[in-house]
Each structure stands twice: as structure tokens, then as C-alpha cells.
Swiss-Prot record:
The modification Phosphoserine is found at S133, S377, S775. It catalyses: beta-D-fructose 6-phosphate + ATP = beta-D-fructose 1,6-bisphosphate + ADP + H(+). Residues 2-390 are annotated as: N-terminal catalytic PFK domain 1. Catalyzes the phosphorylation of D-fructose 6-phosphate to fructose 1,6-bisphosphate by ATP, the first committing step of glycolysis. This is ATP-dependent 6-phosphofructokinase, muscle type. The modification N-acetylthreonine is found at T2. Substrate binds at S164, I165, D166, R201, M208, G209, R210, E264, R292, H298, V299, Q300, R301. Pfam families: PFK. Mg(2+) binds at D119. Keywords: Acetylation, Allosteric enzyme, ATP-binding, Cytoplasm, Glycolysis, Glycoprotein, Hydroxylation, Kinase, Magnesium, Metal-binding, Nucleotide-binding, Phosphoprotein, Transferase. InterPro entries: 6-Pfructokinase_euk, ATP_PFK, PFK_vert-type, Phosphofructokinase_CS, Phosphofructokinase_dom, PKF_sf. Glycans are attached at S530. Its EC number is 2.7.1.11.
Amino acid sequence: MTHEEHHEAKTLGIGKAIAVLTSGGDAQGMNATVRAVVRVGIFTGLRVFFVHEGYQGLVDGGEHIREATWESVSMMLQLGGTVIGSARCKDFREREGRLRAAHNLVKRGITNLCVIGGDGSLTGADTFRSEWSDLLNDLQKDGKITAEERTKSSYLNIVFLVGSIDNDFCGTDMTIGTDSALHRIVEIVDAITTTAQSHQRTFVLEVMGRHCGYLALVTSLSCGADWVFIPECPPDDDWEEHLCRRLSETRTRGSRLNIIIVAEGAIDKNGKPITSEDIKNLVVKRLGYDTRVTVLGHVQRGGTPSAFDRILGSRMGVEAVMALLEGTPDTPACVVSLSGNTAVRLPLMECVQVTKDVTKAMDEKRFDEAIKLRGRSFMNNWEVYKLLAHVRPPVSKGGLHTVAVMNVGAPAAGMNAAVRSTVRIGLIQGNRVLVVHDGFEGLAKGQIEEAGWSYVGGWTGQGGSKLGTKRTLPKKNLEQISANITKYNIQGLVIIGGFEAYTGGLELMEGRKQFDELCIPFVVIPATVSNNVPGSDFSIGADTALNTICTTCDRIKQSAAGTKRRVFIIETMGGYCGYLATMAGLAAGADAAYIFEEPFTIRDLQVNVEHLVQKMKTTVKRGLVLRNEKCNENYTTDFIFNLYSEEGKGIFDSRKNVLGHMQQGGNPTPFDRNFATKMGAKATNWMSGKIKESYRNGRIFANTPDSGCVLGMRKRALVFQPVTELKDQTDFEHRIPKEQWWLKLRPILKILAKYEIDLDTSDHAHLEHISRKRSGEAAV
């Protein structure tokens, strides 16, 4: 791409105007989206307008439609709800209301609309778009607009972003606000768990979601609930019997509590609502357990947005502006959505149609189809939940095959959830499951024990590594490891860990030439806060670390805002990998993020200081700079702090903060719990297949490259990749993959921090079709 094409991005929007509004129920992350739309809009030369109070503001006009400035979206990122307000609007449903809205837009020269809201908001605006030409004709006929204004505003472009905590919109894996709502729910479930254990209580928790069970389903996976009621899959007719037996069995195995999650739209097979009170009365009557109901209500909509929602909102906001700038009269109204970790554009009406199809399927009691229509993510969650919650745990020990599970490397939140899932699904498949303490060192020393169903009870929500983890690699102890593999008859190995787990896998492959005992299938599940394991876009634990950094940055920004004219330099973990610094920079609204993957010079540091000097002249008198711990051996945190202190003398003062090991701790976030649970399940299923495949003459012999894999999330799917094939994609000296997907998000961070950069507009989402997308997902 030439410099001219790069430069074009800054002039793409000159002479055009865009209005941004939030509609329907509020959702955390909407403010991050509004901020991104405003700042990227201004960056490209657009005039950007806020529409306050949703569609009502569009109809009422006047002070409700105000031009936005760069500073007007400052300090919005960490706020829940929507700063520009939202309201349900009857007027907009009537043609008269839409006529007034069109008049208000034309008079301000606005021909682009960015709507952030739920499914109801989206259908309303599509009607508005299809009527646009007729509305303008009427306005011109009544003399309210001139012929020139009519020509200038001849067509209206609309882009939608789905902001809803329910995650009930088909076509996107996650809607803005869902992850934050899960944070609120899981925080409450964790808090309730301690009181429930103290009194041996059963808790029935009712969560939001209208007619979609996503929140309830993911919550049940994230906290290891005993039962979940969701509208998409009503329980069998004798569910009362099954539920009571399940609760009773759990207590018999030594559990002191029961957790039941109920979606607010839960129904039975006949469409009759199942309420929290019904369930409570049933448990009290049949089992006599002390049972309490907690209806979570609007707590789920509130609070600070999670790092995931801030990044999702920012990415979607940027993509929305690009979609509007590229729009033509023939472009269909599109929804910017998320598929895996990729931004995609989908035709609005296709998404609305599939969302309606789900409702129709549920009304007609075609529940299996409803689950399929909800999409790949929902189906995967449901399958794993059924495996873990609705299967009777095996009574007898011993089994078909012996699988061992271990943690390697530094602790990461979510490791325990992955171990729990691996152990329990292994037992369900009839295998004997061993746990290895202290990584490869423990495997060499024989620190191995058999795990039963209850061994991993309550592990999902616990941080760190309960098995113990060490960075020791297997190379020096291959002989002892081989001996213990034989001694304990280990036929498959699940290694959960970071870069050491991956390197250890390579060493085991290499050791096969010397020791036949090592010819057993193994799988590496990436779990590290650094997110630096080749073969996977995400690692277990990185999301929790990211949220920890975000929370700290929010507090530091608040301190800086109070002090005025202060810049904070914060050092994050990650080794040589700049994932945490970059993503936290995006989520916390940093002015700069220094990373190893993007080399920088003293001149770059100088430019950043000059940028902050200019910033102090505005109403935003504070700065936040992130530095990855190994981004440069000479430009250390102390060096950058000293440089900023000297160059900022008399203009701003500087402070530094090294976050350290707090980034490895804490309870895992819902994303990490859910991701770890699914990774463990997928790895165990693969392992069972590989062991059967490798069984010859009464023993396991696996020496093909595909018998030692990394299980990773690649764009839109979980895939197994042989460790030997990943060697060429690895920079071993710096312990990072040679190519990293998140580097393409760096320009967004710089634009949102008001840097004049060259933006490559060629790398954007293209319009896809939901039907094609779904048929392609079937194999996943």
C-alpha cells in the first residue's frame, strides 16, 4: 500500500457526518464503542454527532443531537451503561416520528447512522433506512427541506453494533455487554458459594436473558452448577425426579452445597414457565434441604465493563466507521459482529431472520434446531455442560486406559478449570485418570496419584495451580520420566501450561527416538498470562491477567485525574510478548504501549513525551503509558520514567508502577473458566480417539507427528496442530510465535490516543453471509 493510500484514511470522511446512538437496554461496553466511533470518525475527517436518549433523541432533535469532540469521550471507557443515554421510543415506530427524525438528520447533513442496541433497535432502524427516500420526498413537498438538501442526503447508510447482555442475536459469537454481565453473575455466585457451604444450603439463582439461555448456560459451566434451566432446551417430563436425584447424589459424595441456575425465560416441554420459586418448593418438599432463591436482576447490567467488552466495543466501533465510509446506496444495512477473534460484517436482515427463526423454532417446540440456530458457541457450551452435569459419575475405579494430566510453567488462572474438565470427562469415558504434581519434575520423581470425581470438586473458580507447577523441562529427566510412564502405565498425557509446556512437548517428541515409552499421545493446552504459545490465538489465564491490569489502570487514571498533570508509567508482564501491554492499552485507554514486537527508538519516546505535553494543554490533564517488561533491555521502566520526568518538568510529573505477580493471581474470569473447561473437554475427547488409534498388540505405540499436538484457538475454531509443525512458526530465543494476530490492533490503540498515523484501510472485514457462515461451522 502506498503512502498516498495510507494518507487517504485521514481524508475519507471529509464533508460527511455521522450520528451515533445507543438504544434499548443498556449494556456495559457501549461507552467504549461510542468512544471508538467518535475518535475514529474525527480521525478520518468526519463530523460526529451524539444522539442522546436513543431514537427518542433522533425524533425530538434540538439539544438531543450534539456534535462530539475528541475530549467529550474522555474517561468514558471504564464506565458502565451508556453516557449518551438510551430510551425505548414509541414515536419512532410511527411514520410521523420517523419523518421528524429524517428532518433532524437532513438539517445537520447527517447521512450515516451508527446504532448500538439490541435486536428491536436494529429492525426499527432498517425500516427507517428503507423509507428514507419517501420520507425525504414528503419533507421536500412540505417545504421543510430544500432540493439541494434532498440531493445531498439522497441515501442513508446504517451500521449496527449489537449491544445486549443477553447474547441473543444470531450472527455474532458475543454481543457487547455479555462478558461483563457474566463477570457480575460469577462474582455473585462465588460470593454465594461460601455462605452456601457454611450452612449446607441449596441456592437457586435466577439470571437475565429474556428468551435466551446463554448467560445461564455459561454461568453454570463457569461455576460448576448442579443443574441449569434454559428456554432452548426444556428438561424432560420427569425432570423433578432427575433434579432431586442429582442433588442428593452430589450431597452423598460429600458436597456441602448445591447451585441451580435458572434463566428468566425457562420453560418445560409444554411451554409452561419454570420459576425459581417452583424449584425451591420442589427441593424443600422432596429433599428437605435448606433452599434459598436469589434473583440477580439489574445488577447484571451494571458495573465496570470487562476488558473483553472494552476491546470488543473499540474494535467494533472502528469497523463500524469503516463500513459507513465505504457504504454506497446499494450496500445493504450491515451488522458488525464477532466470529472467533475476527470482526465480520453480516447483512442485517439475514441476522434478524435467523434470530426470528430461533423464536419460531422454540414456539413450535423444535428445541434441537433452536440450539443449532443459536450458533457454534452456544452448541459447544451445551454439549460440554451435558457431559459434565448430566452424566452419572462412574462408581468403579480403574478403566479402559490411563491418562495423566499435569501443569507446566508459571501459574495461570483457569488451569484448575482445565484440570477439572480433563479429569471428569476422562472418568466419564471410562478411563483411569492420574494427576501429576509439580510438572515434569513431578513426573520424573513419581509425584503421581489417581484422581476420582470428587478430587476436582469446586476447582473451576479457583485461581493459580492446585496441582503445583514448575518450569523444569523434561530433557534432563527423560529416563526417569520413561520409567514412571511404564510404572504407572500412562497411555496419554495432557499438559496444561505456557511456553515451557510447548517446549516440553517438543522435547518429548525428540526423546521418542531414544525411549519407546515416550511414544504415547500427548496434547498441550496453552495456559499462560503471556499468551505466547505458538498455535493458539488465546491462552487460558490471559483474560484474567488483562482484567487485573485494567482494574489497576482504572484506579491509577482516577488518581491521575484528581492530581492533574500527571503521567503514569506501568510495567506489565508477558516476557517478550506484548499481548498484555497492547490489549490492556486498548482496554484502559493508554497513550502508548511499548512492546518488543514493535521496536522503538529514543525518537519515538521523544514523540510520546511531546504528545503528552500537547495533551496537558487540553481538558484531559493526565497520561497513561504501558511498558511490556522485556520490550527493550536498555529503555527500562526506570529509564522511561526518568526521561519523562526530565522532559516533562514544569508541564507534568511522572510516576511509575510495576504490577508484578498480581497479574498471575486472582480467581479466573468467566471467559477463562469457560475456555479452560471447553479446552479440557476437547483435549480429552481427542486423547481417547488417539489412544484407540495407537493401540496395537496390547500396548500403545504412537510415533506419528500428529500424536503430539497443541490444542489452540485459531480465528474461528479449536484446532489440533502437531508440535513439530509449529517449530518453524516459533522464535525460540524470545519465546514468542513469529506471527501474532493482535499486532493488527496496534494502530487502533494509537488512533484512539490521538496519534497522527498512517492507517492501512485495506485490512477490514468484508460482507459475509450468515447462512454460508453457519454451514462452514458445522464441522467445528
